[in-house]
């Protein structure tokens, strides 16, 4: 990544050579110029076997090569980060699993994600695991996904636009859906749902964690992402 920081220097050298290269003499090993981006003097190394234009072309080629390298590294870094985040969410699902059928669904997710091969001839298993279901003190149903597949189904197939969605901020955890039935959600239910989102996340052992909450219609699926990964916009 350090080498990619040189790319702008090479681009500027190429531009300056195209601007001031007329003053370079055959056989010169450097060219003194003023960087018109910051007004500072700059010494540009030259290959004495090349013309100023050829030296400029060489620097632009170096710039473009480093730019491509940086773009590739940025994409790879994001891909690795996404994989780590996904595996952390799977680890969280294992932590909150309570029965064998919960583990079966986690295994199915790992097969669908390509981490585990399905045994030859074996069919997709029937999933019997269901989300946790709680009733708030105000009588509202609160559902908690046990894994990414359940999170995906809860948010995008079960919940409707005016239901409320809760999730621990910036960390792997369960999607919590509160069914409103078109009613106003009381403060106590907001707090209870937020506690569920905190408890069923990787931050459950921390003294205090933030929880985001929005109406389900504000939650969007990320194209091409693993199941359960979303984007959303809060209004607070």
Segments from the language model and where they lie:
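Extended, highly charged segments
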Residues: 1-236
